[in-house]
Amino acid sequence: ANNNSNNGKKLRETLSETCTRRRAEGRNIVAGINTGFFNSHDGFPRGFHIEYGEPVFINNPTVRQSLSNHRPGFTFFEDRTVSFDNRSFTGYLKVNDTDYEYYSVNDTIVRLNNTDGYDANLYTSRFRKEPHPGIYNPVGSDALFVVGRCSQQMTVNDGWFDATVTAIVDGRNGASVEVPFVSEKTDWVLQVTGEKAAALAAALKVGDAVRINANVSIGSVSKQIIMHNSSMYRFLNGGNWNAVNDATLMPATCIGADQAGTTVKLVCVDGRTSIDTGMN
């Protein structure tokens, strides 16, 4: 396993492999360029990621707020404009007339090995129990798990989605339970702890109708998103070159946007020889 280290190929999917896989899925791919993070050894992307509106990975607020390189991302909106602005996220489960906030999607915070205090977090079919043979995603069981099924796959900035509670698993107070995982794109699991778990346990039963949403703002804009990917750094933003002042000669790629936000620019830098200037 990669163990989240930059230690070579191992289980990571290269960009070429991603293009090959997507073409086999029927995507019309002309070329690919790295914009940020890669799939980790845990089997899900690192950083904020939205794919055809689906919230594939939304990292928890502590990471989003404390790490400046986790704030910006490349966004391609449904109206065919683009942006590199910072992003924010809010998500809610509506039970009757009460909204219960959740804070992340498919984040390792569900392992319950931190003290951040975010008491409700969602995971979907993207979060797999065994993403690769012999590699497992642990989920903390000392929580209430609400399993739901939407009438259609939930996408960001598309309002409320109707859902039905299909299972409730209560692992609180040390109860021995099997943590639920889902395999359908319409399904999700909400892991809840603390007072919010007590409130939901009292309010819900299997078969109940609920509603759920996922809202992403890019800068001051909140509209339908086709793709969003963590860009790590904004080297080319609003038509302005903002590359790091690094004399190290190394290859680099990035994706940028013009000032109007209507043109995408792909940048490839060859820094492998002494005659190259790298990112300078």
Explain the meaning of each model-derived region.
Residues 1-280:
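Gly/Ser/Thr/Pro-rich low-complexity, intrinsically disordered segments
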